[in-house]
Structures are given as C-alpha cells and as structure tokens.
Amino acid sequence: MQVRIADYPELRKLCWNRPPEAVLDGADALALYERNWRHVDPEALEANERALIQSLATRYGGGVLNV
C-alpha cells in the first residue's frame, strides 16, 4: 500500500520535513503515526484519514494502533 502525504492533513504535519508529494510505504506510514501520535489532533482527523489509519492498523499492525 502506498500513502501520498499530501492527501492526509495530520500525516502532512508529521512529515513536515518531507515534500508533500512524497509517497510512503504503508508500514512506514503506520510507524510514523504510532511514533508521533502525540502530535496528531484526533479531533482534526478527516473521515478519509481515520479510514486510512484503521486500514494501516489492520494491514500492518494486527488490527491495533499502538499509541
């Protein structure tokens, strides 16, 4: 699974040091969310980003988001 940083506002904040058009491997995206969850505003998550995080957790995290 490939994740385009520019498509997800909270992920874009976590990847401030990468170009917005960059694409991450799904496992790397999940690792970024998990490692930096303290910087994610859950209230600001859009529906598509919530769905992405759930999909990543299911696919790469055994159904669990480790935060």
Model-identified regions with their sequence ranges:
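Short, charged early-sequence alpha-helical segments and their helix-coil boundaries
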Residues: P42-V67
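A generic structural signal for solvent-exposed, polar alpha-helical segments
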Residues: L14, A22, R38-H39, E43, ...
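N-terminal acidic leader/helix
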Residues: M1-A27, A31
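Amphipathic alpha-helical segments that form the core helices of the histone-fold
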Residues: L30-V40
